[in-house]
Design a protein with these regions (language model features):
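Hydrophobic Val/Ile/Leu positions in short beta-strands of Rossmann-like dinucleotide-binding domains
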Residues: 1-2, 60, 136
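NAD(P)+-binding Rossmann beta1-loop-alpha1 motif at the extreme N-terminus of oxidoreductases
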Residues: 1-49, 53
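Hydrophobic/aromatic beta-strand patches that form the interior of the parallel beta-sheet core
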Residues: 25-27, 47, 85, 108, ...
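Short beta->alpha hinge that forms the Motif I/post-I loop of the SAM-binding pocket
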Residues: 29-30, 62, 87-89
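Rossmann-like NAD(P)-binding element
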Residues: 49-85
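Rossmann-like NAD(P)(H) cofactor-binding subdomain of soluble oxidoreductases
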Residues: 72-122
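Internal alpha-helical scaffold of NAD(P)-dependent oxidoreductase catalytic cores
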Residues: 126-211
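Interdomain hinge/lid region at the active-site interface
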Residues: 198-267
Length: 275
């Protein structure tokens, strides 16, 4: 069962059907998403919470500010052998809010490190998770048999599992994921504010510009809650980023060519990590 039939939930549904031959049913409070998911064959049937007890797996793929509430509600209805997973890109707040539920052990806090800038059921992709990382948090609090099932699902989707604490997860994702979205959003906003001629933007934009602002097409209803839920870490990342931007601005204003070159060389090291 998938709750939330957008990009991630829909892609998971496609993977579960093709790789594990699951019968996938779904819930989404957006009627249009439900109809699209049914029409596209992402789910076979719409159901409600009364049928959760019969599910082997319930995947919660709603916006991050609603995940804890939905997980707690799902845990109220699950059968003894039901695995509940989420896919939120912020983990600490979710884990804290689910911690006291009597059936906490049936929950595996997960984050598939994959996505695109598109949203909704029509954005769902088979193989979206292929070769990507599945972050699992607080695994020591999950029932080991259900955790094994989560690991088996991750393996079947050809994902690389990384276990970590919610605190570490949220800190690292602020730098490698959330900050890049802020940067892309604000770059897009800056260009739109300064370059009023949309035709010029389209005609002169290089592939470098297009790839840099690609994330600016991401859905605000998804990303606003992420920034707010991970506010402390995103602010830390932004502070460091702004410090580097201010330093680069100073070097440019004072014509420090060697220092500019050195800054670029230092940044180039990232390609050795991201081969």
């Amino acid at each position: 069962m998938i709750i939330g039939l957008g990009l991630i939930g829909g892609s998971f549904a496609l993977e579960l059907k093709k790789r594990l031959q699951y019968t996938v049913v779904g819930i989404d409070k957006n009627p249009q998403h439900l109809q699209e998911a049914l029409a596209l064959g992402i789910i076979s049937e719409e159901i409600d919470y009364s049928q959760i007890a019969d599910a082997d797996l319930v995947l919660v793929a709603v916006p991050v500010n609603r995940i804890a509430q939905v997980v707690n509600e799902v845990l109220d209805h699950v059968g003894q052998n039901t695995l509940v997973m989420d896919v939120g890109s912020v983990k600490e707040s979710i884990c804290k809010e689910v911690a006291q539920h009597p059936r906490r052990s049936q929950f595996v806090a997960a984050h598939p490190m994959a996505g695109t800038e598109y949203s909704g059921p029509q954005a769902a992709l088979y193989d979206l998770f292929d070769g990507k990382v599945m972050a699992l948090c607080e695994v020591e609090k999950s029932n080991w048999k259900l955790l094994d099932r989560a690991l088996d699902i991750s393996k079947a989707l050809n994902m690389r599992v990384k276990m970590m604490s919610p605190t570490d997860h949220d800190l690292h994702t602020a730098y490698v994921s959330h900050l890049s979205h802020v940067s892309s959003f604000m770059l897009g906003k800056t260009v739109l504010e300064i370059e009023k001629d949309e035709a010029q933007i389209f005609d002169l934009a290089s592939t470098g510009f297009a790839s840099t602002v690609r994330l600016a097409k991401s859905h605000p209803q998804m990303w606003t809650p992420i920034f707010l839920e991970n506010k402390t870490n995103v602010l830390k990342a932004l502070t460091e980023y702004i410090k580097n931007l201010e330093n680069f601005k100073h070097l440019l204003e004072t014509d420090q060519a060697d220092a500019i070159t050195q800054n670029i060389k230092e940044a180039n090291y990232i390609r050795k990590i991201l081969k």
